[in-house]
Amino acid sequence: LSIRRQRQMCIRDRVKGICFTVGIELMLGADIVVAADNCRFSQMEVQRGIMATGGATLRMAERAGTGNALLHLLTADEFGSAEAYRLNFVQKVVPAGQELDEALAIAQRIAAQAPRAVVATRLNVLKAIEQGQAAAVADFIPVQKQLANSEDAAEGVRAFVERRPAQFSGR
């Protein structure tokens, strides 16, 4: 299992200003990233005669495709938040100064969901990426059975019927 899959919790990050080399690699290790609209990015190891070894070669290709990854890894060109968004390196771009508030708002919306369902969903997405869709699909029924028999699933249905926000317990 990768380190990403070993984490149970969703990691969200926010970036602002200059995000070069290891900054990009740390950012790409997060599940959800919010960037300020004034960010500058560059993966510049090749300018220093070395290779990016903190995960950029893997995660850039995973998120943006081989050609886009190689374009930025091999040229060390600087790019902005709009390009990072286009490449799926960041999931939201907000005006500078609002990135922390937006990241916290996303974290609060995730925290309001059923904890076991959040973990199961996140792990299934990562399994599909790392082991293929068939492996992820194979987990659908057994994982759904566990979740459907939980107190949180019962609370989710009750809350839907009663038209109120659910109060999940993690059980």
Predicted regions mapped to residue ranges:
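Short alpha-helical scaffolding segments that buttress acidic/His motifs in well-ordered protein cores
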Residues: 72-73, 121-125, 144, 160
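Single conserved hydrophobic/aromatic residue that forms the stacking wall/gate
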Residues: 1-7, 11
